[in-house]
């Protein structure tokens, strides 16, 4: 999403200065954008108040200890973010899914801190397409309702990725700035590498045998679903694929999913047609490798997005409404399944796996039609109105 955002901005505003707010250390020499440190403590210091003062003291003490023990880490810079924000013209939030009753209070407060900072420093803000809700908060999170109602009224535009999220924000919190839009990666027709990278990135992907299917699991599915039931499902799905002379590849879209890939491979320890790819693919590499498959069985949202963007059909095994609405955009809703505990319809999944084996070429054409429709609009077109409106 970051690379698409930079590409879209550079296309519209070639001379703009772009900063990626991150807690990580990136080699900026590789990119056509800069970074600004965006750690929790720096955010709290920039927000001020008692919490900000406390975090400032903690930072000073921590740096003093590092000096005493000669810890080789850059120190200081407590007010970097506070000095930086008044100079910014626009904040673009490209979070994926951070607000809803499935997340803990602290994580949601940190998400809302982004809006608090924009509001405090009077910076225009756009929340790019992301998932919201449900908001059936337990008693200890009830205060979030008032915070969401107040803070999400500040951004110039709040893009909800799903209809359900848009309806919840409009009806539950009476927000007037909400619009619905598909995922920004799906809307992007082409990533302009020259506008994003200072050096052409090296893309390394393994060779994939013909007549192959990718399986892209998601660790979160095993948190929302039942482990043994899911492993049994994967075993039966892979049996269906193998019986159709298909090569099966297990690969991860996120680092944390390698353990799940390994668990599934352990179901077929001696079968040479079940391949475990341990590669830590970049988003560009994942995009390149997914094109090699006839279709994919995916549980990662952006794994499905990259598949659809390359007109690769998917059977989606998901745990939230966002998966079904994504499939709906691509005329693929029959292939999206809820695999949360007590919701696994194993017979239907196996039925549609067999159907996909027979019809994946026809499904590709349906996806092409859906993708063409999605790409007729672009959420970044709103920026001209926001900046100059």
Give the ranges of each region predicted by the language model.
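Active-site anion-handling motifs in enzyme catalytic cores
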Residues: 1-389
């Amino acid at each position: 999403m970051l690379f698409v955002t930079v590409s879209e901005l550079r296309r519209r505003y070639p001379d703009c200065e772009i900063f990626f707010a991150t807690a990580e250390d990136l080699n900026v020499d590789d990119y056509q954008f800069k970074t600004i440190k965006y750690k929790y403590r720096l955010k709290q210091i920039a927000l001020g108040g008692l919490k900000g003062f406390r975090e400032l003291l903690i930072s000073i003490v921590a740096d003093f200890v590092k000096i005493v023990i000669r810890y080789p880490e850059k120190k200081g810079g407590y007010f970097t973010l506070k000095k930086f924000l008044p100079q910014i013209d626009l904040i673009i939030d490209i979070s994926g899914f951070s607000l809803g009753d499935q997340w803990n209070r602290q994580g949601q407060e940190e998400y809302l801190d982004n809006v608090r900072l924009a509001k405090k420093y009077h910076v225009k803000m756009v929340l790019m397409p992301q998932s919201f809700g449900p908001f059936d908060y337990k008693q200890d999170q009830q205060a979030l309702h008032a915070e969401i109602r107040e803070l999400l009224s500040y951004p110039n535009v709040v893009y909800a990725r799903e209809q359900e999220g848009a309806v919840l924000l409009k009806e539950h919190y009476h927000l007037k700035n909400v619009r619905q839009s598909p995922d920004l990666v799906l809307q992007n027709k082409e990533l302009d590498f020259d506008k994003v990278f200072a050096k052409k990135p090296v893309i390394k992907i393994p060779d994939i045998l013909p007549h192959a299917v990718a399986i892209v699991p998601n660790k979160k599915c095993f948190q929302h679903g039942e482990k043994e039931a899911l492993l049994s499902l994967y075993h039966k799905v892979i049996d269906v694929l193998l019986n159709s002379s298909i090569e099966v590849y297990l690969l991860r879209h996120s680092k944390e999913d390698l353990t799940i890939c390994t668990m599934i491979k352990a179901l077929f320890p001696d079968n040479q047609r079940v391949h475990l790819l341990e590669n830590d693919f970049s988003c560009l590499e994942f995009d390149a490798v997914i094109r090699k498959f006839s279709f994919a069985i995916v549980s990662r949202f952006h794994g499905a997005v990259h598949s659809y963007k390359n007109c690769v059909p998917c059977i989606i095994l998901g745990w939230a409404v966002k998966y079904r609405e994504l499939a709906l955009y691509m005329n693929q809703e029959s292939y999206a399944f809820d695999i949360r505990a007590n919701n696994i319809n194993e017979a239907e999944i196996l039925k549609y796996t067999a159907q996909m084996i027979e019809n994946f070429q026809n499904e590709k054409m349906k996806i092409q039609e859906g993708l063409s429709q999605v790409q007729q609009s672009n959420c970044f077109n709103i920026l001209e109105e926001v900046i100059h409106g």
